Every structure is written in C-alpha cells, then in structure tokens.
C-alpha cells in the first residue's frame, strides 16, 4: 500500500495508457473472482495488452484512491487534444534561462546547448515558450535572442556576452508606465516587422486602419508601409491628417500588444497627441471616438495657418528670452527641454539663432504650430465634437500635459480641457 500516496501509481499508469492509447494487463491477475457476477456487469479485468480504441473521443478513464487513513478519492482523466504544429511567424524569439547560482546557470546554458544539438528539429517557438512560461524564474538569469533553433544553439555554445546576456534579477518593479509621443515621431514603415510577424498586433493595427478608411475615407496603408525613399509618401506623412491618426493607431497597437505580454501599465503619460492615446487606453473615451477625435484634429490642423515647431535643449527662461512676438512656448517637457511653436519663418529664424549660440535646437517634422495662438480658430469646432462624445473618469491614472500633475476626473471628462489641449 502506498499509504498517503495511494492512487499515485494508478494515476501515472492511466496517464501513460492515455498517452499511448494502450490498455495494459493488471499485475498478478489470473482468475476473476467468483463473488462478482461478471456476465451481468459491463466491467472486466484486463488481462492482456491491447490497443485502446473508441469511436467516442476523447478517451477518458477513472482512477480511484483509497488512502490508508480512510480517504477516498476519484479522479477522471481525459486524453490531451492532438498537438497542432502550425506555421508560426518567423522572427526573433527571447530564450530565457535562470538558476539559483552562477554555477548552476552556466550548467543550464550548457545543458540547453547540448539539448538543442541533440534535437535540431525542435521548433524555437516551443523552446522559447516553455522556458518563458513553464519554468520558475530564479535570481541568476541569462537570455538571448535568436531566429531559429540552430542560431540559439550556436549562441549558447559560444557564450558571447554581446548575444548571451547574463546578470542578476533586480528588485521586482511595482508597475510599468507607458509613454506615448506626439506628432513628429512618425516615419515610413514604422512597426512594419511587428505588423508582419505578430498576428495580434497586426489585427489591432488593421482594425484602426480599416476604421479610418471606412469613417474618414483615408487609406493609410500605401503611405505608412511605403519604402523609406518614397518621396511622395514622405511628403504625405507630414500632413497632420495622415500622421496623427497613424501615430494613434500605432501607439494603441503597441500598448495592447505589450499588455497581452503581461505588461499592465499602472500609469500613463502622453506628449501632445499622445495624451489622446493615454485617455483612450485609460478608458476616458472609446477607441472609435478617440480615432474620430484624432482624425478631426488632423483635418483641422491641415486647414490651419501653416507653421512649425522647434525642440530646444534649454531651460524655459532661456527660451522665453529669445522668443519673438509671433512665437509661443508650447511645452516645457523637462528642466532643459522645451518646445516652441509658431510661423515657419520665425521657427527657422529662431533655430538659426540658437545654433549660433551653441544651443541644440531641432525642427519637429510637422507642418503645424500646435499649442500656439495660431490654433485658436480651431478650438470651437474641436470642442463641439468633444461635446458629442461620452467621456468617463480614467481607469488608469495619467499625467496631464496642461497641469503637470495627475489628471482629475473632472478634467478628464471636461470637453473644454481637451479643446484647450490643442
């Protein structure tokens, strides 16, 4: 008798029988008991090895355990579904390892290299997935990025620190903060590889692209995924009605993708347009309405007086002292990081002046003067659209561009706040 482990042997035997789809004979069985009316019963004692077949799939079996202390238990087992070897997306995979000591970690690296050497046909997806999800993470860790099993084996065997990163785990983080950029961060082909390799990310991005085409009549695909040397596409990507929806769709796609991987944000912050993305992710406005808002923002900027923006590495007082009457200090992004907005000629003149003084200043690749007096005529139609939307208190806290502190429920649900945000 297995005492408190009663039933374990039968459990293991039954799991193996299901796996091999084979019924094995009962140990030491010779003659059925005459005290049981076998002929009137559906039960029998199996006395020979035979295939376990049935038309009623899946196979199931019951295992009873009668503990020596009087415990009675019954477990019903069912065969696992057939393993499907689908065609996974090509691309790099993270292969992690961990151990309780540096010596054990080095041994784990060697064992994995030997295992991949002995089983070259193993899909890297399976190897990476098992190590990511099926192993406890200890303090001493190693990780590499590889595109196939052969490359992973070579990197493990070589132990090159430029490819095999080894170190100790830091203290657990309390959470993650997602940061969303604003207009000017766009470039042709952004996230093209992610779009090709990850179906869930592609589905999220395509959802936004399809919605924009259906509701606004704007098809971003030929522009977004154009080659970097496509001059016409580059010019088109400077238009606010093109770049702003593209950035919003990408930012939401990346955020959702990270959240699927387990990176749940505990706080958000967005720069300019990025605060619209933060509001959407925080639940202030739904996806469809947020995309419509961003599309309107882009159209209004298209029709606004032409202008530009300048990113300046200097403190606010230094920047203010150099502003002419037509320029505005649009944003104070940090102690020595400011953004200036205004007419293009004045922006170019200020950039030249700052360069002559040795102050770093870079023109933002956008053809509008956001957050300046030039956008005041846009506020009324923008706020009118906002008043047609249903706004909710944020479910994830995010920082306000306008106050520099956490946005309040009243601010987040006030159309006037978002109109002044322009």
What are these regions (language model features)?
Residues 5-9, 99-110, 121, 146-150, ...:
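Electropositive phosphate-/nucleotide-binding environments in soluble metabolic enzymes
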Residues 1, 137, 304, 311, ...:
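Acyltransferase
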């Amino acid at each position: 008798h297995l005492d408190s482990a009663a039933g374990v042997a039968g459990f293991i035997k039954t799991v193996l029988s299901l796996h091999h789809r084979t019924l094995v004979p009962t140990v030491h069985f010779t003659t059925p008991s005459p005290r049981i009316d076998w002929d009137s019963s559906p039960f029998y004692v199996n006395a020979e090895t035979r295939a376990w077949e049935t038309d009623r799939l899946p196979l199931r079996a019951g295992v009873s355990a009668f503990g020596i202390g009087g415990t009675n238990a019954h477990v019903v087992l069912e065969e696992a579904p057939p393993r499907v070897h689908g065609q996974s997306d090509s691309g790099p995979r993270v292969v992690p390892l961990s151990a309780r000591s540096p010596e054990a970690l080095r041994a784990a690296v060697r064992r994995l290299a030997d295992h991949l050497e002995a089983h070259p046909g193993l899909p890297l997806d399976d190897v990476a997935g098992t190590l990511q999800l099926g192993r406890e993470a200890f303090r001493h860790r190693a990780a590499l990025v590889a595109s196939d099993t052969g490359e992973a084996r070579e990197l493990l065997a070589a132990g090159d620190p430029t490819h095999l990163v080894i170190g100790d785990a830091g203290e657990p983080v309390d959470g993650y903060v997602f940061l969303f950029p604003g207009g000017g961060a766009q470039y042709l082909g952004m996230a093209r590889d992610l779009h090709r390799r990850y179906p869930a990310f592609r589905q999220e991005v395509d959802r936004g692209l399809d919605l924009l085409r259906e509701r606004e009549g704007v098809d971003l695909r030929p522009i977004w995924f154009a080659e970097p040397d496509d001059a016409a596409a580059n010019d088109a990507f400077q238009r606010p009605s093109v770049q702003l929806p593209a950035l919003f769709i990408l930012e939401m796609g990346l955020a959702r993708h990270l959240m699927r991987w387990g990176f749940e944000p505990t706080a958000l912050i967005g720069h300019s347009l990025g605060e619209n993305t933060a509001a959407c992710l925080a639940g202030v406005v739904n996806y469809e309405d947020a995309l419509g808002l961003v599309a309107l923002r882009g159209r209004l900027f298209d029709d606004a007086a032409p202008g530009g923006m300048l990113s300046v590495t200097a403190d606010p007082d230094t920047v203010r002292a150099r502003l002419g009457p037509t320029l505005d200090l649009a944003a104070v992004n940090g102690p020595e990081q400011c953004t200036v907005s205004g007419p293009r000629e004045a922006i170019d003149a200020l950039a030249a002046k700052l360069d002559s003084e040795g102050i770093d200043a870079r023109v933002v690749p956008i053809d509008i003067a956001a957050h300046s007096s030039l956008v005041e005529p846009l506020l009324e139609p923008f706020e009118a659209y906002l008043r047609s939307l249903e706004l909710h208190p944020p479910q994830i806290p995010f920082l306000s561009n306008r106050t520099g502190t956490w946005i309040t429920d009243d601010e987040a649900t006030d159309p006037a706040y978002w109109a002044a945000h322009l």
